[in-house]
A protein has these predicted regions:
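Polar low-complexity intrinsically disordered regions enriched in Ser/Thr and small residues
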Residues: 26, 84, 93-95, 107, ...
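Generic low-polarity alpha-helical segments
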Residues: 48, 79-83, 129-130
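Short aromatic-glycine-(Arg/Gly/Cys) micro-motifs in beta-strand/loop hairpins
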Residues: 21-42, 100-117
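Repeat-associated, polar segments at repeat-unit boundaries in modular proteins
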Residues: 50-68, 122-138
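Generic detector of low-complexity/intrinsically disordered segments
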Residues: 12, 36-37, 87, 135-137
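Negatively charged, low-complexity tracts enriched in Asp/Glu with abundant Ser/Thr
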Residues: 1-16, 55, 59-95, 117
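Compositionally biased, intrinsically disordered low-complexity segments enriched
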Residues: 90, 113-115, 138
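A short, exposed loop/beta-hairpin motif centered on an aromatic-Gly-Thr core
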Residues: 39-52, 114-128
Length: 138
């Protein structure tokens, strides 16, 4: 149900969520943004060391019902996946996650870049994507 609300929110706002970990930075290692498809709309979010706070700010500002559920999803799934990928590919990696709506489903894109190369996977199952990335070497 919670992801259904997120799906509707993204579709109605023609928006995507970007969560990026940049291990090359010394501070504010995360970027969290709500990106609108309409380039006339300003994106919301910022660079931070506290991604949950920025996510909460974005959803509260947009009067999203179910903010706590989104934060739980971030903490239990997205953040967990980022930590595992950091351990696999190195803390200096850049890991980007884009969450978007496409054809009535939530679509995840995970992009990893480190000194050895880059890798990008897209699909509807976030956990399956990051598990597949763990099997690969870049």
């Amino acid at each position: 149900m919670m992801l259904q609300k997120l799906l509707i929110f993204l579709k109605e706002n023609s928006a995507k969520i970007l969560i990026k970990y940049d291990g090359e930075r010394d501070i504010k290692k995360y970027t969290v943004r709500l990106l609108y498809s309409d380039i006339k709309c300003r994106s919301l979010g910022s660079d931070t060391d506290l991604p949950c706070a920025i996510l909460k700010e974005i959803f509260v500002e947009n009067e999203f019902v179910g903010v706590e559920e989104i934060l739980d999803f971030y903490n239990s799934t997205i953040s967990y996946g980022i930590e595992i990928l950091k351990n696999q590919f190195g803390g200096g990696s850049v890991i980007s996650i884009v969450i978007a709506e496409k054809d009535g489903a939530i679509l995840y894109t995970i992009h990893i870049q480190n000194t050895n190369g880059t890798r990008c996977l897209t699909g509807v199952d976030y956990i399956e994507l990051y598990e597949n990335l763990l099997l690969e070497k870049i």
